[in-house]
Amino acid sequence: MASGYLRYPDIHDDLVVFTADDDLWLVPVTGGRASRVTTDHVPVRNPRFSPSGTRIAWTSYLAQRPEVYVLDLASGQQHRLTWLGARKLLTIGWLDEDHIVFCSPHQTNDVGLMWLYTVSLDGQIERLEYGPGMDLAISPEGDIATVTPNSGDCSKWKRYRGGTAGQIWLRAAGQDEFTRLLRDGEDHDGIDVEAGRYGVGWIDGRLIFSSDMGAVLPDNPTEQAQLWSVNAHGADLRQHTHHSEEHGYVRDPRTDGTTIVYHAHGQLYVMDGLDAHSDQIDVELGIGAPAPVPVDPTDRLQSIASDFGGDGSLLEWRGAAYYLTHRSGPARALSADATARVRSPKALGNTGLGVWASDVTDDDCLEVAALDGSGYRDTGEPRRIAAGQLGMVLWLEPSPAGDKVAVVSHDGRVLIVSVESGQVRQVGRSAQGEATGLAWSPDGRYLVWRQARDGEDSCGAIFCWDEHGLGESFQLTKGTFDDSNPVFTADGKYLVVLSARTFDPHYDGQTFDLSFGHTIRPWLAPLSASEPSPFGPVPEGWRISEVQDAKAKALANAAGDSDHAPTVTCELDSDGFEERLVPFPVASGRYRSLAAVKDGVVWIEEADRGGELGAARAGVTGEAPADALVHYGFASRRIERIVEAVDTFAVSGDGERLIVRHKDEVSVVPSDHKVDAEDPAHVAVDLTRLRRRITPRDEWRQMFDENGRLMATHYWRDDMNGVDWEAVLRRYRPLVDRIHSVDDLYDILWETVGELN
C-alpha cells in the first residue's frame, strides 16, 4: 500500500517517475523508498522521461498557468521552456532527445481546442502537422496515433458517450491519411465504441490506451476504465486489465516499449508486458500527514457583519465564525469546528447573540451563540435549530429585534425561523433560481426580497411578506425591469431598490450602433400611498432647520444625552406600489450593494476600469480606479462620496457606522459623512489579532463531505439516476486520508462526481 496519493507515472528501464505532494518523485519499478526530485510544492502533471532517461519534462503550475519545464537528472537543474500563459497545457512526451511534445490552445480562441506542438530545449516552439490533439504516440516503425482534445480523460467523464469524447486516430507508417479507431458500425461485441479513449502508447507493435468502453449502460454501469490494445491497423481489440470498483479507473497508462505503468485510486501499477498481470508498486514517500499550518487573517475572509453598535464584527473566516472587536481586544472563535463549515455569521439585533448557518449536523442548521464566546446561555456550545428543515442555506438575514431569521434555501424557498422555538415557516418560493436581497422593515413586520421572473439571468421582481397578513408573499414590482437589492429606510417610511430602468443609449465608438451602458439608479417608493416623495419641489420648500436639527441630534447621541429612539411602525400599501416609485436625484450608473443607514442610504458606485479585456488601460501606470461608497442623506438632500475605495461594507445595527473593506484593510467610519484616516472617528481594524492553525486533512475531509451533500442536494433527479451515492462516497472517502495537497483533493472530487455520469 502506498503512503500517499500517487499519480501520472512514467517509466524508463527500472525507474518510475510520478507526482505526489505537488512535486515529482522517483522510485524503482520494484517499489520502495521514493526520492523527491523537485521542491516547488505546486501542482504538477505528466512527467515524461526523455528517450535516454537523462531528463524529465513535465507540466508545472509554478508560474500560475501551466508551462513546460525540463529537469536534468545528472545535475538536478530545472528550466522553464514555455511562456505561453494559456489556461491549458499538457506535456505529452518527447519527439526525440531534444524536442518535447505538448498540447495547448494558446493560438486559438477556443480553450478546448488544443493543438500539438514541440518545444526544443532552447525554447523554440513549432506546431506539428497532425491537427488538434491532446496526446501523441509514434511507434518505432513510424505508426502515428493521436487523441482528439477535450477537457480530460474518462475518469472525470465516466461513461460519457457524447461527441467530445476523446477518439484515437491512426496513421500507419508510410500512409498519408488518418483513420479513426473503433468506428460506429464495426463489430465489437459488448463494447461501446462511443466511449472516450486516452493515454496512447506503443508496445510490441500494439497500441495501448485506457477506456471505460466496457461499461455498456444499463447492463454493467460499474465497469471501470481498463487497459486495452489494438494492432497497428486498429484491429484485434484486447482487454488487459480487470479492475473492479475497489481498484478504480485505469488512468494515464505509459510505456517505455517493454513495461507499462499506470495509476488508479492514487496507487501505481506495473505490467511487465501486455500478457502480464498488473502488480501494485509499493511506494514509501517517507512523509507524514500535512502538519497544522497558521492561517493568514485575510485568507478566505469571506464576509464581515457588524454588531448592533459597530463595536465589533462577526467574520466568516475559512469556514469558521469569529467575533472581532474593532478597537483592540482579542478575537473570539464562536464556532471553529474543523469538521463543519460555517456561513454568513450575523448579529441577532441588540441581543448580544449571533447566528450563522452550519453543516455540523450533516444537514444545514442554524447555530446561535453569544458574541462573548460563552456559547448559548453560558453552555459553552452554540444552540442548533432547524436542522434538516432548511435544505442548503444560501442566504440568511436576522430581523432587527433578533427574534427571527429569514433564510433562502437552495430549492428557492424563503423561510422564517423563530430563534426561540426553532419553528420553520415557509413564506415564499422562487421558482426561477434563488431569491436574493433579503431585507427586513425596521419593526420586523415586513420581509422583502428579489426573485427572478423567467430565469436566473432574467429581470427580477421585488416580493414581500407581511407578518400580519395571510401568510402568503405578494409581488410589489412586475419584473418588467431588473429590480434588486430592496431595503427599508431607517425611519420606516420608504422602500428603496436598485433598478435598471434607465434607457439612455450611447453610440458605439467603433461601429454605427447603440447600447445601454449605465442603466441602474436607486429608486424609492413611499410605503404609504399618502406619504409624499422626499424628492422634488414642495410648496413650503425644504426646511434648512431639519438639517440643523439632525446634526444637533447626532451630537447629542454621541454625547450620550439622547433618549431612546422612538419606535418605528411600518404600514405598507401594496396597491399601486410600483407606480409610486421615483428615482433618486442621481445620475444612472453602475451601482450595487444598496443599504439603509441612519437618516439616509448608501451604495457602491463601481469605477470605470475599462473593458473586459483590459486593453483600455494598457500601459497605464498605477492601480486601476477603485469603487467608491456613496451616501445620500434625506435631511441634507445631497449625495456625497464618503469612502473613496471600497470592495464590500457592512452597516452597524443602529445604522450609524460602516465597516468598510478594501483589499486586505478593514476600517470603521461614520455612515453619514466622510472622515480622514487621522480623524478619531476613523478606526483601522487590526486583523492580525485573528490567529488560527488548521490541519489540512481536516479541512479536506469536510470539503469532501460537503461536496457530497451539494451533489445530492442539487442533482437533477431525486433518485440520483439510480446511483447509490452514499456507497460512492464511502468508497472514495478513505482516499482523502492519503492525500498531501489540495490538488490531490480536486482529483478525488473529479473522480467522485464523475460517478454520477
Walk through the language-model features, giving the residues of each:
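Predominantly a core beta-strand signature of beta-propeller blades
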Residues: 33-36, 76-79, 123-127, 167, ...
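Blade-terminus and WD-like Trp-Asp/Gly-His loop motifs, strongest in beta-propeller folds
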Residues: 10-13, 47-55, 91-99, 137-145, ...
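Intrinsically disordered, Ser/Thr/Pro/Gly-rich linkers and terminal tails that flank
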Residues: 582, 593-596, 605, 613-757
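Extended repeat-based solenoid scaffolds, especially LRR ectodomains
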Residues: 305-311, 547-587, 595
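A flexible loop/linker signature enriched in serine peptidases of the S9 family
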Residues: 19-25, 40-44, 59-69, 82-89, ...
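Conserved blade-ending motifs and adjacent loop-strand segments that build the rim/top face
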Residues: 238-252, 341, 474-485, 588-592, ...
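A short helix->beta-strand "capping" segment at the edge of beta-propeller domains
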Residues: 1-4, 34, 286-301, 380-382, ...
